[in-house]
Design a protein with these regions (language model features):
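Extended, charged alpha-helical "arm"/coiled-coil substrate-binding scaffolds
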Residues: 2-67, 129-340
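Non-catalytic surface loops within mature trypsin-like serine protease
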Residues: 19-21, 113-117
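Generic hydrophobic, aliphatic-rich segments that mediate packing or membrane embedding
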Residues: 50, 54, 67, 71-75, ...
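Active-site helix/loop of acyl-thioester processing domains in fatty-acid/polyketide metabolism
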Residues: 59-83
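Extended, domain-scale alpha-helical bundle/helix-rich regions
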Residues: 78-115
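Beta-strand/loop-dominated core regions that host nucleotide or nucleotide-derived cofactor-binding catalytic loops
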Residues: 126
């Protein structure tokens, strides 16, 4: 067997594996023998069909399985032995020659590999990101006051029709509620904006290049039957932005030796469950009910993965906020909403 590596650039490799008959012959023989033991052909006792008949019916299948087994082992070994940090899985190359599945042949397989980029940057106090304090504009406050008045009018009208108690609100009460709601709303939005700006800042600072053509092909193969090339093109920029942040986040987790433990996952799952119940108006549920739901969430690996990513985000953001300069910046709510 011969394995040769062709470096296209820092992010792309072409791997050629030449499998000779001697590499797969013994594996093929064992697979044919196994088929023979289990074969049940009319006119022959089980396991007693002649080898020629077994080869006629199962020969190509056993050949393909044997070659693929050898090929897979060689591919995995080369990646491990050469410490290749590959993205996703190797893809059959567009330069792959046609394979003629004939017993005794030598076979050539060509693979494209996408490689993770090297990431290296420092986090210093000279890294500056604006931290917004939002002043609510008169226009936004007037809109909120108008919406609240309509809300209470409709609520009291419904209460009157049902002979229920009304909730009387003075103009002063509504003005106060509007101010409180807007303050809370823009505080949350400013916190979200700060995290977004920090994320974008360090993704740009890292200057990460990716094997984009490979990634498009890999996404199509990995999601075969679920997405089209057009779907991938449409969402590709968003995918790249998220992927780059994942790489930056992973680099910073390692740089600062940040870890996620079971307690982190449990607390995050509990917060997630509590929020989900609150969305349906179910607050102040018994602790036992919350914990039962948490246990179920943590049994779902996809949920655990999402929760772990959120915990990583939180840990990395907290650390970055300590290490960089957050520049206090006052802004009106109208201008804040216009930020890109």
């Amino acid at each position: 067997m011969k394995v040769s590596q062709n470096k296209i650039d820092d992010l792309n490799l072409e791997l050629t594996i030449e499998v000779e008959a001697a590499d797969y012959a013994e594996i093929e023989r064992k697979k044919l023998a196994e088929r023979k033991r289990n074969a049940d052909f009319k006119g022959f006792r089980k396991g007693m069909a002649p080898a020629s008949l077994i080869k006629k019916f199962f020969g190509e299948q056993c050949l393909v399985e044997a070659v693929n087994q050898v090929l897979s082992q060689a591919l995995d070994a080369h990646i491990k032995d050469n410490s290749l940090r590959i993205i996703g899985e190797p893809l059959s190359s567009e330069n792959q020659p046609e394979v003629e599945w004939t017993d005794g042949n030598n076979f050539t397989f060509v693979f494209d590999l996408g490689l993770y980029p090297e990431i290296n940057f420092d986090v210093v106090k000279d890294d500056k990101v604006p931290s917004y304090t939002v002043t609510v504009s008169a226009k936004d406050k007037a809109t909120m006051v108008e919406n609240l008045k309509k809300y209470y009018e409709e609520k009291n009208k419904s209460a009157e029709e049902q002979s229920a108690a009304k909730e009387e609100k003075s103009d002063e009460d509504i003005e106060k509620e509007a101010a409180e709601r807007l303050e809370a709303q823009f505080k949350n939005e400013a916190e979200w904006r700060l995290s977004k700006d920090i994320r974008d800042y360090f993704v740009n600072k890292a200057g990460i290049s990716l094997p984009e053509a490979f990634l498009k092909r890999w996404l199509l193969v990995a999601n075969q039957g679920k997405v089209t090339k057009e779907d991938i093109e449409k969402e590709f920029d968003a995918f790249l932005a998220d992927f780059r942040w994942q790489l930056v986040r992973g680099y910073l987790m390692k740089k600062y030796n940040l870890k996620i433990d079971e307690k982190d996952l449990h607390e995050a799952a509990e917060a997630f469950v509590t929020y989900q119940y609150a969305m349906y108006g179910l607050g102040n549920l018994p602790k036992e009910m919350i914990q039962e739901a948490v246990v179920n969430v943590l049994k779902n690996q996809e949920q655990v993965q999402r929760i772990a990513e959120n915990v990583e985000d939180s840990k990395v953001m907290s650390k970055l906020k300590e290490e960089i300069t957050l520049e206090p910046t006052k802004i009106t709510s109208l201008k804040f909403k216009d930020l890109k």
